[in-house]
């Protein structure tokens, strides 16, 4: 006989909310395999992969410009912390991944901030982590943005990430446009 007092305490679960945008999202069905607005639960030992290969990735993009495995998110627990954190690893040999203003090349990884902008090709992801108590599992939730996220969230404008992954130093080292006097031309 189970009573209310004997019932297990329900723990809240860490949720990684991902708002995504691609300029061709309405015409091409790029995100047709992603369930928007509903939460999906994963065990905390699972590495969640994103890419175009449905046999290897939990989340797939219907786009030949995306690598078979584009990037991976792995939960972990920081030393002396009671909540889950995430690290992101670029799995693409041909395209760099931008996390805020940090460029990740092939197999580079970093800890994911609580809120950050992730970009590759023409894809834009706004990732936001909501802490939970459980370290046994976590959830993901996708939201489709009707507008580019860089402008909508007042993030600094950045040059698009070229598909060959090679950046021009002109774009990566300049943070704002330079003003010139017309006599300097």
From Swiss-Prot:
The modification Phosphothreonine is found at residue 9. Keywords: Cytoplasm, Immunity, Innate immunity, Phosphoprotein. GO terms for biological process: cytoplasmic pattern recognition receptor signaling pathway; innate immune response; positive regulation of canonical NF-kappaB signal transduction; protein homooligomerization; tumor necrosis factor-mediated signaling pathway. The keyword RNA-binding does not apply. Coiled coil: none annotated. Its main location: cytoplasm. Phosphorylated at Thr-9 following detection of ADP-D-glycero-beta-D-manno-heptose (ADP-Heptose) by ALPK1. Phosphorylation at Thr-9 by ALPK1 leads to the formation of an intermolecular binding between the FHA domain and phosphorylated Thr-9, promoting TIFA oligomerization and TIFA-mediated NF-kappa-B activation. Residues 48-104 form the FHA domain. It is found in: Cytoplasm. It holds the Pfam family FHA. Homooligomer; homooligomerizes following phosphorylation at Thr-9. Interacts with IRAK1, TRAF2 and TRAF6. Interacts with TIFAB; binding to TIFAB inhibits TRAF6 activation, possibly by inducing a conformational change in TIFA. Interacts with ZCCHC11; binding to ZCCHC11 suppresses the TRAF6-dependent activation of NF-kappa-B. Belongs to the TIFA family. PANTHER family: TRAF-INTERACTING PROTEIN WITH FHA DOMAIN-CONTAINING PROTEIN A, TRAF-INTERACTING PROTEIN WITH FHA DOMAIN-CONTAINING PROTEIN A FAMILY MEMBER. This is TRAF-interacting protein with FHA domain-containing protein A. The gene is Tifa.
């Amino acid at each position: 006989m189970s009573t209310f007092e004997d019932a297990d305490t329900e723990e809240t679960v860490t949720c990684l909310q991902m708002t995504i945008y691609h300029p061709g999202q309405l015409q091409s069905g790029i995100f047709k395999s992603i369930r928007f607005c509903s939460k999906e639960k994963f065990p905390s030992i699972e590495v969640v992969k994103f890419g175009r290969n449905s046999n290897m990735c939990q989340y797939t993009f219907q786009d030949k410009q995306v690598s078979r495995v584009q990037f991976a998110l792995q939960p972990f627990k920081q030393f002396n912390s009671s909540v889950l954190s995430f690290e992101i690893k670029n799995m693409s040999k041909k395209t760099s991944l931008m996390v805020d203003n940090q460029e990740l090349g092939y197999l580079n990884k970093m800890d994911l901030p609580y809120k950050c902008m992730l970009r590759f090709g023409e894809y834009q992801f706004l990732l936001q982590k909501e802490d939970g108590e459980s370290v046994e599992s976590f959830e993901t939730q996708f939201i489709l943005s009707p507008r580019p996220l860089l402008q909508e969230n007042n993030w600094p404008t950045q040059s698009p990430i070229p598909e060959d992954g090679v950046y021009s130093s002109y774009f990566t080292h300049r943070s704002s446009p330079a003003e010139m006097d017309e006599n300097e031309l």
